[in-house]
Amino acid sequence: MYKRQEQQFEIVHAYSELGIEATLSCTPYDRGIDSSEGIGSWAESNAVCFSNSYTSLITNRESGLSALATALTGWAPRWGLHIESNRMPNILVNVEAQMSNLTDWSILGDWIGKQILPTWDLPWGPMPRFVGLPRASFEMQKALAASAANYGCPMLWADGITQDAPEVGSYQGEVTFTEGDLEQRYRDLSPRGTVDLVVIGCPQASVGEARETAAAVRARMELGEAIPDHRLWLFMSSHNYDLISADGTLDLLEEAGALVLKDTCPEVTPYNRSKYNHLLTNSLKAEHYLTSGLNRIPTSVATIIDCVAHAFDDSLADGPTPELDGHSATPIHTAKTHQEDPFESMGRGIPSQTQWEVSGKALVTDVPITYLGYVNRDTGVIEEPGHPLDGVPIKDTVLIYPKGSGSTVAPFVLMGLIYTGFGPMAIVNRDVCPLTLPAASLLGVPYAHGFRDDPTIRVNTGDDVSLTLSDGEVSLRVDARSTED
């Protein structure tokens, strides 16, 4: 653990030496930057969605690599969401739930991602328009954007909250979120078994979230209660930490027995697993990554007031510690069927690669791959319960998938796998992927995209395939079909 801390400090120091301000925050929009406008280059998934949706700052879903390149050069590639015609809603969401609580909004954003079908054409990711939402606080807007980013959402529209959504002829999909859907998600996510620790602040808590937490804490303190064993952790940026320190909120929380941590978040905290094996949070973003391979900790979700209640009383959800059960996960939608016809198609390469030839076994899915937390960083095995490729290694394959999803940390995970020999021999994306392309470009892994025919549908896992790059064009050919399982 201490070695990882030292390495992290080395990275922060290196950035500082470049003249970069080290805010150590995943919520840059929560310190006055929300008034910015123009072209940005942001590499935090929730911040990308918040910026594009609620401010005048325009950014693609950048990786840390491309954002750093923009900082060094002052230029960002003009593509994707920088182009007005690409900033169009592609999913219509009718909301029929009351949405009165902050956690309701977090649940809604995550729920959208679970409805996506692989047949929907979403080249820039899911970009929903919400109809029927009530007025939203800053915290509600933040919660919606953050959890929608779990599934790669770079931008959203909400009637009466954001700028008006551009009119489109038709949507790729239309879904309705009812009060019943909301109640069912709360039931699915509610704690079963003793809660070991409550974590709030993913993304890092705003001043409003800290005050809401403090209000719930104060109500228990007035009854003479205290939080045992520091069972409540609140994560914040230094900027917001200083603000709650000045207004007395910090003193109240610490007096009650809460821990307030700054410049980090629940996702990257090294938990003592001899003490903490069941977490409770108010955030679907936290739940998404805490239960993933990043942490592998059973995590439940509740409102802030219920989270605080569990922090004070560890008997509210009595019983054995729950376990993560990937076998019970709902299968993610897939449209793949076994293909037998001959197949050859032309696509594009990238300017940093001029010529290569690759032959190998294809590993194919029409479902996006989330590298951070859902591809094992040591083995390269996909570990996402319900994913069509769950349990399958990507090592030495021609990896074919639509695009990367989830965290924009993806290229660093992919680069680590390539360095250690557990990465793919070549990558084919249906849509050009800003999370995959930088790693492939820097480390010379053959990369192709933009094929005339969808390779995620037309190629089977196990097919023998050949790819050739020449003059910027890539030919993809199936040499031999796999047998159907």
Where are these regions (language model features)?
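Intein/HINT protein-splicing elements and their conserved insertion hotspots or analogous self-processing inserts
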Residues: L316-G347, P351, L469-G472, L476-D485
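Conserved small/polar residues in nucleotide/adenosyl-binding loops
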Residues: M1-Q5
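Intrinsically disordered, low-complexity segments enriched in small residues
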Residues: A14-E21, S25-P28, E44-W233, I304-H338, ...
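Gly/Ser/Thr-rich loops at beta-strand to alpha-helix junctions
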Residues: P28-I33, N101, P134-S137, P203-G208, ...
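Glycine-rich, small/acidic residue-mixed loop/short-helix segments
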Residues: H239, H278-A329, P438-A440
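Feature captures the catalytic cores and cofactor-binding loops of soluble hydro-lyases/lyases
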Residues: R218-G293, F343-V358, A362-E473
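Conserved mixed alpha/beta core segments that line enzyme active sites in large multi-domain catalysts
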Residues: F9, T23-N86, I91-L108, E357-D390, ...
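Short acidic, glycine/serine/threonine-rich loops at helix termini
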Residues: D34-E44, L81-H82, E139-L144, E167-Y171, ...
